[in-house]
Amino acid sequence: IKEHEPHVEGVAGIWVPVTGIIDYRRATEKMIEIAQGINEQSKTVLGEEVIAVEKGADANTVVGATQKFKAKHLVFCAGLQADRLARKDGVNLDEQVVGFRGDYYELTDQAKHKVKNLIYPVPNPDFPFLGVHFTRMTDGEIECGPNAVFTFKREGYGKTDFSWKDTFDALTYGGTWKLFFSNMKFGIDEYRRAFSKKLFLKTLQGLIPSLTMDDIKPGRSGVRALLLGTDGDTKDDFRIEYHGHSIHVLNAPSPAAT
């Protein structure tokens, strides 16, 4: 461990020289650029809510709030709305998407020298979350986290974000409560850490004991779309459903992105 990460404490480590990360935002922008270069008719539409999916013999039509799009083949990779769009398309789906927010901290400039690579703990197979880790980003920033807390809004990136519909759907689904009851202590600890920088730091110190309160600052948050079974089981692999002219990516676990 010390050879690669002098500030990390641990019993043993596995060095993986081929690991890496990607900037998904830049990758997506590049894909759009390439598509438009291949075909000038390629179009990117943002902010258009999908109201319905109309079935046809040879093609399907996506009905948006202001526009319609007809295509022989549709690919839905909708993340936090994947289950709802699948049902609009007529997919018979028992599982439901539940959102879990992950908060990150960043290392301050004075502490960045303490992380040289990507540092991960040994994951606990009893939980669907990896645990806090250190990630050196493509822009040189270093993220620490995330935690994992149930969010009361599917796109709830803020700690106090709330949606009646999303909360009702999640809390009236039996699988949600089975997940809660089987991971009660874990869930409570995660919520405590979400509102306490000191507790978050204590977890980070499990890997790098020399970190102090001055070494970390609040960073971004993300929401994981967790496909949850009726038995409370988390689906830890890809779930792709083929339905007529459509392909639905219902579950895209880490390190996937939507």
For each feature predicted by the language model, list its residue ranges.
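A short alpha-helix-loop-beta-strand transition element characteristic
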Residues: K2, D94-V97, D215
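Helix-loop-beta segment of a Rossmann-like dinucleotide-binding subdomain
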Residues: K2-I38, T61, N183-I188, G244-A252
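Helical element adjacent to the flavin cofactor pocket in flavoenzyme catalytic cores
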Residues: I14-H73, C77, R84, T258
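Flavin-dependent oxidoreductases
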Residues: V53-S163
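C-terminal catalytic lobe of FAD-dependent flavoproteins
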Residues: A170-T258
